[in-house]
Amino acid sequence: MNQMRNGDLGSESFGTCLLLSLPEDVIAVIARFVSPRDICNLSLCCKSLCDVVDSERIWLVQCEVVKVLPLSEIIQWRIGISSYKALCWFLGEVMKPLVGVWVHQNPELGNVVYVMPGFLSVVGCRIIPQEVGPLGIEEARVMWSPVFEIICGFDGSAKFFLHGRDGKVQCCLHPGFVRGIEKSCNVLLLEVETRREKKLCNEIDETVLLVETGVQLPFRKLPFSYRRNLLHIVTSTVGIPVPDLSSEKLFPTSKDDEAVLLERRTMLLKMHKFGGDWNHMNLEDECTNIPNQVDINKSWKHLGFEGDIRNMDAENQTQRKSFSRYFRSGIKHILGRSSSSKNMSSSRSETRPLNLQKFLNFGDSIGLSLKASNIKLSSYQGWPNMDETRYALYKLPIKDPIANDEYAGLWGGTFGWPPGKCTEDKPGKAFFLLMLSYEESQDGTERLLIGTKILEGTHYGMHPNGSAMFVIKIDSPSFEGFPFDTNGEDFEHSYAGEGTAKGYGFRYPGYKPGTLFVTSKGLLMFIWKATKAVLTLQRLNLGELLRKGVCVSPLPPCLNFAYLIKCHTNVFAPERRRS
């Protein structure tokens, strides 16, 4: 071995040379079992391996391994990106963690955002609560509205856009930044972040990056009113009008869409780089100003404060407020109206502007940001308990069907039998989306199949968002026969359980006995024993439904991301909108 090392192989290790001697196809096969990080680390081991690490064939294989796009689309996407390596980063670090179903508690009819691949992008689409006609769900043109897009840049970087409309019913795009995406993220946050730009230092005549001492106050620590107002200030400033979305394509629906989608992507990349001046620029041009951001002083004044935030002395402000607080406390004591609770409340309220100043002082401007984090969440029957004061979406833990959990996943359906049958007085039926998941009973003696409602297409919420439409004892077969004409269906299984019913008000529904029937074609029917009401469900491919669906205009930007107002009506339906 030593002779081999000192001979023909020179200073190169035998293992390295052996790897280099392998055909590229063999190396690509090996790459399927190696992580992208490990492939990049190969170049640190030996300079001779740099060509292997930069091989397009290896990174094409890595793009396949991510398993978020079919091979045909991966090859199609390559035309707009510098390399498969850059594409692999976008697929693995941006797309894969985000793809899935995201929800919010409000409104009660359902707030479902499905994040799916677009064209060189990730698109968040809100499914509108609606009815479906006699053709059924698969043939229906499902209404949806865009929530956000993340465009893949030429180098694989992520460019964030929030969709929304202004007061004139003009659709706008609001450029922002992707602040961070954790691979196991379960919360998607819309925030404002401070940005510090390079400035010229006259004393030493060179460009320096200003550095702030201390620790920045997180955006989430600001009072809700400041968070809401900052988001409104930024979105109202950086919004860029776009054409009517009904004629726009956000993802391919046919093979002929590639040219149109490439043109739109170029437009979005210019918007992100140049802001409102994008129409007069080329992507190769240099950016001479700071687009898509709001000056800190303007934000400070918009929030009702005077003066230049950079020249304010926080310590003097605190002293003056402490003196005024001491003076007011003395007067209250003299008048006999002193209250410790009021003093504490006053103290907290007076520190809020200082917290805001501390947050804003970390930058020269502010802009939108999207952050995907993993935080500890409690849940009930698979539905996360949410903080309803944060502009956030929560990822549902929808499981793929496996052995013994064959009914897990996303299901859609309507009430009535046979499926799709409508009457003259009711030409459409409310469209329901349910998440089916498995849990153990509280005493641990039974396995339960739970159908959690995440969308309800009625005009007014009849079932609490995130509540169980039915709970099935999956190990307890039912021997009751199907009470209606079978409509040509063969029934394979039936299980006993309970379905939601009127209880103690809207928030606390009761449950009545029922049976879940399973057909050989994969349909599920839950029938309430007393009323004979039938909820018929089928598995859905949301991506395909949305591709052939109808795009409608979004809500104003902040509400479009997360609707924080308690509501039982369909605020997302186009006919209910107000300008």
UniProtKB/Swiss-Prot annotation:
- InterPro entries cross-referenced by the UniProt entry: At5g39450-like, F-box-like_dom_sf, F-box_dom
- Coiled-coil regions listed in the entry: none
* Residue ranges constituting the F-box domain according to the UniProt record: 16-62
Stored SMART domains? FBOX (SM00256)
Gene3D superfamilies found in the cross-reference section: 1.20.1280.50
Q: What is this protein called?
A: F-box protein At5g39450
Organism, as annotated? Arabidopsis thaliana (Mouse-ear cress)
Instruction: Supply the source organism's classification.
Output: Eukaryota, Viridiplantae, Streptophyta, Embryophyta, Tracheophyta
